[in-house]
Amino acid sequence: MKSLLDLFKQFTPDEHFDAIKIGLASPEKIRSWSFGEVKKPETINYRTFKPERDGLFCAKIFGPIKDYECLCGKYKRLKHRGVICEKCGVEVTQTKVRRERMGHIDLAAPCAHIWFLKSLPSRLGLVLDMTLRDIERVLYFEAYVVTDPGMTPLKKFSIMTEDDYEAKRTEYGDEFEAKMGAEGIKDLLEGIDIDVETERLRGDLTGSEVKVKKNAKRLKLLEAFKKSGIKPGWMVMEVLPVLPPDLRPLVPLDGGRFATSDLNDLYRRVINRNSRLRRLLELKAPEIIARNEKRMLQEAVDSLLDNGRRGKAMTGANKRALKSLADMIKGKSGRFRQNLLGKRVDYSGRSVITVGPYLKLHQCGLPKLMALELFKPFIFAQLEQRGIATTIKAAKKEVESGTPVVWDILEEVIKEHPVMLNRAPTLHRLGIQAFEPILIEGKAIQLHPLVCAAFNADFDGDQMAVHVPLSVEAQMEARTLMLASNNVLFPASGEPSIVPSQDVVLGLYHATRERINGKGEGMIFADIGEVQRALDSDQVELAAKISVRLTEWTKNKDSGEFEPSTSLVETTVGRALMSEILPKGLPFSHMNKALKKKEISKLINASFRKCGLKATVVFADKLLQNGFRLSTHAGISIAIGDMLVPPQKAEIIGRAEAEVKEIEQQYVSGLVTAGERYNKVVDIWGKAGDEVSKVMMAQLAKEKVIDRHGNEVEQESFNAIYMMADSGARGSAAQIRQLAGMRGLMAKPDGSIIETPITANFREGLNVLQYFISTHGARKGLADTALKTANSGYLTRRLVDVTQDLVVNEDDCGTTNGALMRAIVEGGEVIESLRDRVLGRTTAEDVVHPETLAVLLPAGTLLNEDGIDELELQGVDEIKVRTALTCETRYGLCAKCYGRDLGRGGLINLGEAVGVIAAQSIGEPGTQLTMRTFHIGGAASRAAIASSVEAKSNGSISFNSTMRYVSNTKGELVVISRSGEIVISDNGRERERHKVPYGAVLTVRPDQQVKAGLILANWDPLTRPIITEYAGQVRFENVEEGLTVAKQVDEVTGLSTLVVIDPKRRGSAKVVRPQVKLIDANNQEVKIPGTDHSVTIGFQVGALIQVRDGQDVGPGEVLARIPVEGQKTRDITGGLPRVAELFEARTPKDKGTLAEMTGTISFGKETKGKVRMQITDLDGKVWEELVPKEKNILVHEGQVVNKGESIVDGPADPQDILRLLGIEELSRYIVDEVQDVYRLQGVKINDKHIEVIVRQMLRRVVVENTGDSTYIAGEQVERSEILNTNEALQREGKIPATYSNVLLGITKASLSTDSFISAASFQETTRVLTEAAIMGKRDELRGLKENVIVGRLIPAGTGLAYHQARKAKDAMDDAERRAIADAEAAELAGVMADDDTAAVSVAGDASAD
């Protein structure tokens, strides 16, 4: 009976496995899987539809077609379970065994597995140390390979053609053995003695780099074979497994035809060729015929395994390449990505969304019909429980007839049962949120307006999907973790996500504006009720300035109670009435201002930090209700008259046109080049456009009114368009500028700027030419959008893949390392304050007062708003905080190093998947930004070029240590250093610092006192000068026309300038660099003071020479100018690829050079086209590098440089930064560069997220010195693994291995993870699986992705606890288990005894009564 009951139990696979191993299958293993050999190519009988015996669908091998019924029908029903029918040989069992039973084909000749042959690098080639070409010739019967040379001078592994073979046979007879085809290769593989080979290779890791590399690779492979117990011979197959038939189905279509899986065709070909070959061999057919058949068999097996990898793909009847086994698992529609990582979900529906303004934040409107369908099982259960229906069938009928009781039950079932809403594309975790459903009529889902920002949803036809969490656990998680009212902050930046937008903002803004001399101005009210009555009776207007007595609630620090305090406040009617909805504990000053979108965001943020989540959600809902009401009352609309075109516009445009004419004039007379002309014209128009928009906004923003006392004053305008833009409800200055200013410069599709701007605006209307130019930009916007969305999605996918296994898995790793944080200052402006950078991080060491050195905060404190306010008061300007990069946790991160969970506002919880959050935070805006280009209609947005710096604050001037300058003949100071900075400090505290470029003219001196607004330095932004530091007479060297310089005659002007040309372009052999030497009055060469080197100033390619031979020059004079290329428009288009480039750690095109060590620069002998640059350090060690002459060298003879300093101009290579400056500097570089791109678009992302990704890029190390470990020098290993190995070695007193950091790009890092399942499901599936199978890899299932694929809970969030408990349970040995079981039994016995005594005493009590 028990066995019968077990039968109906749900079949659950034992999920107590900790790892999955992949390996090569031996022939014995394949036979052990098989249930019989497939001998015939037949599939099913076309008349009876029964499978043919011994065919590809044979019931005897694979199992019955109908449940518990044999093929001939002799045995039917459950009672014969397990019987094997003697007539048809079919076992009586469930038909689903046809999904798991395999067959096999015995190959008449061995066949090589194509993956190990053709997947690069060829594994067969590595093992045999033969070239792929040779192996292929042997395998496909074009050549012989010597398998046993015997006593002959032939070499084993050598290749010979047919003719050679015949000759050698006649020469040596049967002394040697040579074979063709896979047999030969198999013999060679089986003849390899792995131990001997590894010993030989270990001793041979010397010599040329190529050889060492190759030997190391071979060694690694052979060691893997040895370790995993896989024999190399198994790469050549003798037995081919056959997939279970239900996984390659054959379905009859109507009309007598069949739809079949391609695999059946491929198997059929293999079987046909195999049986033909077997017959030929039995008939002892001539060698040449058998050989051809063997080749064909090899090809058939190849295309079964991976069609199209070698030669032409096999095609079916319709000329379409057949889908082989490899195609089944790889790519977007393969097994991994289609079925394992992305599944379709039951209990789900989708519909259009509409707005539900009356909903609470945690609710959504669910159409009744949809709910009825989704909650069916729950309704059935209720119907049965109440006895309304007796069977499921009856319940179904009841539901379908739609009786009132069904709807009542539905209401009840839905109560407190959250559903999840998802809007595709789900770019971050706020793309799926849970809501409590409210049943509504109609067919559209209703969505709360405040969650639209998080979903990025609007109501122009968007659709959303609904999912029902079924189990109690799922409901609980949805309710506690995913409910919309629990997710009010963006995980990317920690800012509120439930900020109102559009009409709500407009309503709130309009109600909180103040109007000078409004109706009822100056009235004083006793309380808010009085204000409301005055407004209702039309005594005052909303925007009038009044005074009113308000009650504010402040939290008592000690008791935690709220205490009221009353005061008279000057405010406006609207603000006073709005104060009613403020949560307790938020001061009225937060609301006593015009509420723009930014202000509302700050208000909600302040509320969250001060009053907590619940109060904030309620507050946001009230804001929303009021905003809708007020914007309706306001009734703001726009008319064409609101677009005021500034009267100064014509004059500004006239001025610009005059300037452009002047530039054209200069161009015609040859003072500027064509490139400079274009740049200057674009610049003039850019500035003119900005000026027009400035005067336009000034005109829109202010209006003149008469105040109470009859004076004319200015107030902020009540112009509708201005109010919309100013409040942040809709539109921006850029759009208003196009309506009422001028459209300005447009960009071509390639990003270059069209130099004729559109001077008209939409209010005036465009003429045909202007319209035509407009279409350029607009089209670029749309094309961009389409292309970039895909790129951004791919970037997100790579980021998620590289970080998916990073989870917070301990509280504190105990490290004291960290990074120093200070405010980011550029051009004297604080771009990101220290506050923003350290908020929500943990201090790495005590924070001390800068002067008294008193400890303000101990190490390990989480910095929150209050703590930072305190530190800002004390004047702390740098703090060392813990970062994700310096965390010492293995296989994860610790909570302390990560700091605050930005999406929830407290310290991060254990089990939080911070890697995925980081990836989503960086990927999500990428998609956003790329979808946002077309709004401005392609109007060129270009960062105006700086040509000067001005002081932003008062103080005294000092220069940094690298600043060098000379005084020129006019007495101006000219900067001749590359990294000079002007520092303004006040009382010893640095206020600002500005970088000044080479060639700038300084207008201040050291220690000068300056006032804010003073110009400190200016320069020509469009050219880069080459300046002399010394005086003398110019003597050109190698300045020969046609050789190093060319006369550039301008087509327009006929004037000529000398321009330096690339010496590579001409035929002369000796390479010369055009340069200037200076001659003093005595006709001697001027020397660099303190050395005997002559002053030589080289010209770069492209420089325009400004001086003549023999001219006298003074210090600071310009010898030549190099024009700077025209600027492309900078938007995220340049930005997204830039982000991808940084995360892929690509070496930039013309990368700059960093100094390899600290020392003195000197220049050695020049070689062809290159300068030999040398650095000599204090110990006399010399490092040298050849630098191409056209590169801009930033240093000069005799200059002392520090390790890692830039010495040749160009973008830095992250690999160099890591090598020379270390991890912290690298992280700073990547974080800053990525942030620059996003900041340009006004997107806020916390630095943490970028650091998390950099941590993952640095997770592998390169072994340098192997010590006593089994590693090979130069091998890449996971950092955690080498740390574990080294600890084990040190415990045994052996020498640990040393290693150096290596930076991998995100794609590379994803593919080189220890988890082969994760890597295979990412990209290059074939290569990853091939490698893993040969290595016999184990996947420890640490990451999220691997666990999703094998169908377990992920080791993050609530799953982390589950996995830890499971591991702990597995770790308990049997003895402990027994002990616990005994204890429990004893306890149970005790309880029983207790129960007995208790029962007795109860009885006693009863009788005592």
Swiss-Prot record:
Classification via SUPFAM superfamilies: beta and beta-prime subunits of DNA dependent RNA-polymerase
Gene Ontology biological process terms from the UniProt entry: DNA-templated transcription
Cofactor(s) of this protein: Mg(2+); Zn(2+)
Note accompanying the cofactor annotation: Binds 1 Mg(2+) ion per subunit.
Pfam families, per database record: RNA_pol_Rpb1_1 (PF04997), RNA_pol_Rpb1_2 (PF00623), RNA_pol_Rpb1_3 (PF04983), RNA_pol_Rpb1_4 (PF05000), RNA_pol_Rpb1_5 (PF04998)
The protein's Enzyme Commission number: 2.7.7.6
Binding site for Zn(2+) 1: 70, 72, 85, 88
Domain of life: Bacteria
Annotated keywords: DNA-directed RNA polymerase, Magnesium, Metal-binding, Nucleotidyltransferase, Transcription, Transferase, Zinc
Enzyme class, first EC level, given as a word: transferase
Catalytic activity: RNA(n) + a ribonucleoside 5'-triphosphate = RNA(n+1) + diphosphate
InterPro entries assigned to the protein according to its UniProt record, in alphabetical order: DNA-dir_RpoC_beta_prime (IPR045867), DNA-dir_RpoC_beta_prime_bact (IPR012754), RNA_pol_asu (IPR000722), RNA_pol_N (IPR006592), RNA_pol_Rpb1_1 (IPR007080), RNA_pol_Rpb1_3 (IPR007066), RNA_pol_Rpb1_3_sf (IPR042102), RNA_pol_Rpb1_4 (IPR007083)
Entry keyword Ligase: no
GO cellular component: DNA-directed RNA polymerase complex
Task of the protein: DNA-dependent RNA polymerase catalyzes the transcription of DNA into RNA using the four ribonucleoside triphosphates as substrates.
Subunit comment: The RNAP catalytic core consists of 2 alpha, 1 beta, 1 beta' and 1 omega subunit. When a sigma factor is associated with the core the holoenzyme is formed, which can initiate transcription.
Family: Belongs to the RNA polymerase beta' chain family.
HAMAP family referenced in this protein's UniProt entry, alphabetically: RNApol_bact_RpoC
Protein's UniProt name: DNA-directed RNA polymerase subunit beta'
Organismal lineage: Bacteria, Pseudomonadati, Pseudomonadota, Betaproteobacteria, Burkholderiales
